[in-house]
Amino acid sequence: MKKLLLVLSTLTLLSFTEPCYKVTSVIASADAPDMKKERVIFGIKQLAEEIVSEKYTICSDGSPITVDLFSIEAPTTGVSIGPFTAIKKETIIKVKITKDGKEYIGEGTAKTTVKSTLIELQDENLPFEKTTFASAVKKSLLDAVSKM
């Protein structure tokens, strides 16, 4: 009888445990200008695992979670009045996280601004900032995970 109670209590405890997850794949289906895709994917996988672990349990044999970076937009806008110039680049990242067959879309935005006086910028397009990109990716992942 004691064994039966022990087995039943163990099964009850196991049924109430939270499911664990694993970030199995990261796909960058969008073009990443001036960046190596392998480095982008590796960084996103680490970020995704960190962010998902704040809400769910992560384990090596958990249910799969996939991340798809499907949109990278980086429009540049600028104003020039006489010797004064201000240029702003907004990096907009969109990710799709698939968990348990459901898709969650997240969007993140980060901005880079350059102001100059009496100095001409070499290139009207601002370079693709890695820190700005990482910030936008993190915001998009946080947005998608918050919808789970």
Where are the model-predicted features located?
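A structural "domain/chain start" motif
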Residues: 4-57, 61, 109, 143-148
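Compositionally biased, intrinsically disordered linkers/stalks adjacent to structured regions
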Residues: 27-30, 122-148
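Solvent-exposed, acidic/flexible segments
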Residues: 37-41, 45, 86-88, 126, ...
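Surface-exposed short loop/turn segments
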Residues: 54, 63-126
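Polar/charged alpha-helical tracts
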Residues: 42, 63, 100-102, 135, ...
